[in-house]
């Protein structure tokens, strides 16, 4: 069983912000086959199908670990994949990583504090301009919006391939270092 957690902040205020790219990808991965198995104990929206659990924590980003831990403790997945935004990567860049530091990402820090860092990460670049907090909580620019569908589709495909493969192989095949904006 594999748990895929997409990080973001709950509520309409944050729906289209850069910090919610993990939520956007979970929404793309979830099709009509997935059954909603959400429960208050999970502190998140949880969907399950064919050995795959999709999670969107309903905690705020800084507390994402509580939701990931609750789902992990209940379902005991063999594999955990976390999808999140990354300020240190250019907009549209996609990188894959297992373990390592949080890179200052508060959602990743929260997960690391509660379950350790022995899980796979799909890092989606959002770039960085000015104050980090305002930037991640801001909506995508018009130029970014034009490329967002392509970036999300590419990353969704990479995650689907990751489910069937090893992170090192997928990293070699799908890593995008410079972003997808042309």
UniProtKB/Swiss-Prot annotation:
Subunit structure of this chain's protein: Monomer.
Residues involved in tRNA binding: 14, 60, 62, 106
Active site: 19
UniProt site (Stabilizes the basic form of H active site to accept a proton): 85
Subcellular compartments: Cytoplasm
This protein's name: Peptidyl-tRNA hydrolase
Reactions listed under catalytic activity: an N-acyl-L-alpha-aminoacyl-tRNA + H2O = an N-acyl-L-amino acid + a tRNA + H(+)
HAMAP family for this protein: Pept_tRNA_hydro_bact
EC number(s) from the headed UniProt entry: 3.1.1.29
PANTHER family tied to this protein: PEPTIDYL-TRNA HYDROLASE
GO cellular component: cytoplasm
Molecular function terms from GO: peptidyl-tRNA hydrolase activity; tRNA binding
Enzyme class: hydrolase
Keywords: Cytoplasm, Hydrolase, RNA-binding, tRNA-binding
Family listed: Belongs to the PTH family.
NCBIfam families hit by this protein: pth (TIGR00447)
Function text: Hydrolyzes ribosome-free peptidyl-tRNAs (with 1 or more amino acids incorporated), which drop off the ribosome during protein synthesis, or as a result of ribosome stalling.
Gene3D superfamilies noted in UniProt: Peptidyl-tRNA hydrolase (3.40.50.1470)
Gene that encodes it: pth
């Amino acid at each position: 069983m594999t748990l895929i957690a997409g990080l973001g902040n709950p509520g309409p205020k944050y729906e289209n912000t850069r910090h919610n790219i993990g939520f956007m990808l979970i929404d793309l991965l979830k099709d009509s086959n997935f059954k909603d198995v959400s429960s208050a104990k999970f502190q998140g929206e949880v969907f399950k199908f064919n050995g795959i659990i999709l999670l969107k924590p309903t905690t705020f980003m800084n507390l994402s670990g509580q939701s990931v831990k609750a789902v992990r403790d209940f379902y005991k997945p063999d594999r955990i994949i976390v999808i999140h935004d990354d300020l240190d990567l250019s907009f549209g860049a996609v990188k894959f990583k297992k373990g390592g530091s949080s890179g200052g990402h508060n959602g990743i820090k929260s997960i690391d504090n509660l379950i350790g860092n022995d899980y796979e990460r799909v890092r989606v670049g959002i770039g960085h301009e000015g104050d980090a907090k305002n930037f991640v909580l801001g909506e995508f620019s018009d130029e970014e919006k034009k490329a967002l569908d392509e970036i999300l589709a590419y990353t969704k495909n990479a995650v689907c391939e990751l489910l069937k493969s090893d992170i090192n192989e997928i990293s070699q095949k799908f890593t995008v270092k410079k972003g997808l904006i042309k």
